[in-house]
Amino acid sequence: MFQELKNKYLATLKSSETEDWLDYRVIRPLCYFLAVFFAKLNIHPNAVTIASMFIGAASSIFFYHGSFYYEGWSGLWLNIIGVLLLCVADLLDCTDGQLARLTGKKSRLGRILDGMAGFTWFIPIYVLLMFRFYQHHSLEFGWLGIPDTEQNALIATAVVTALALYSGFACMGPQQRLADYYIQIHLFMLKGEKGSELDSSEQQQKAYDETPSEGNRLWKYFLKTYIDYTRKQENSTPQFQQLVKLLREKYGSAGNMPAEVRQELLRESRFLMPWNALLTFNFRCGMFFLFCLIDLPLANFLFEIICLGLLTLWINRHHEACCKKVREKVQTP
């Protein structure tokens, strides 16, 4: 019975190779039982995703408050509530995919909503963190020896706002977008086209052009957003795009690549997956929670810009170098 339950659980995962330890051992099993529960209630996966968006966005209200240093125990508990709400949002966001695989209710809209979920959480969170810094900044001012005047507070908040905008739109968004793409590439190499969601902007553009505007304006807006999302993924991985193009030209489809080519790509991808996992929710939010609880949310922006930025650059360059090496081997007669 246990083995049967385990097999059913594993069937709802994309692959154990793309999950980190916490996801595979704790979060995904919880999500499986939630998925079974929602399936019995006939709840659609997209409804679960939308619920996660609202819950994650609501957590921003609690992160607005200073933690123990500034607001004592009440502030600490408010931040802990924010942490719990964001964890629930992530739990639901993970459940939607397992529910879709369990019930067969997969859709392009579900993929689009899943990609949007994190942004709907962190846009309000980052906005309110700017206001939080304006209210509570004596720790940073004390360390830097800055007089705590209204003028200095406004100037410092303007700097933090610039950091938050850059961190959110130029770092977190692209980092998670690239991490998601590398997961889909790994699944494509591991399971082929049917086992991955490796979409191309060309395919999405075709779907957009073939969809009539009448009565589909909202859907076309979602498609347009997803086209932009996939195009940015492709622009970040030129060597991989060239490799896929060559494989299609030589073998009719990238999925028909020789086994030795697939294994070489998988070997390099398996090496990168644990590092790639650091760009996804668990590690990123673990650090975010820590910085908020110790009353240093400013450090989160610097961490994303510097530490995760350098990690993303390294992963991208390593993967691109691998794709270039494999492409040159395939080109050689």
What is each stretch, according to the model?
Residues 45-53, 114-122, 273-282:
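Select subsegments of transmembrane alpha-helices in polytopic membrane proteins
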Residues 1-30, 181-333:
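C-terminal membrane-associated helical module and adjoining short loops/tails
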Residues 64-67, 92-94, 174-178, 314-325:
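Juxtamembrane membrane-interface segments at transmembrane alpha-helix termini
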Residues 54, 58, 113-128, 191-201, ...:
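Small-residue-rich segments of transmembrane alpha-helices in multi-pass membrane proteins
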Residues 6-23, 27-29, 33-41, 90-130, ...:
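Cytosolic-side membrane-entry/anchor segment at the start of a transmembrane helix
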Residues 56, 60-64, 125-132, 292, ...:
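Structural signal for membrane-spanning alpha-helices in multi-pass inner-membrane proteins
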Residues 130, 147-186:
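Alpha-helical transmembrane segments
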Residues 45-109, 122-126, 150, 157-170:
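Membrane-embedded alpha-helical segments that form the functional core of polytopic membrane enzymes
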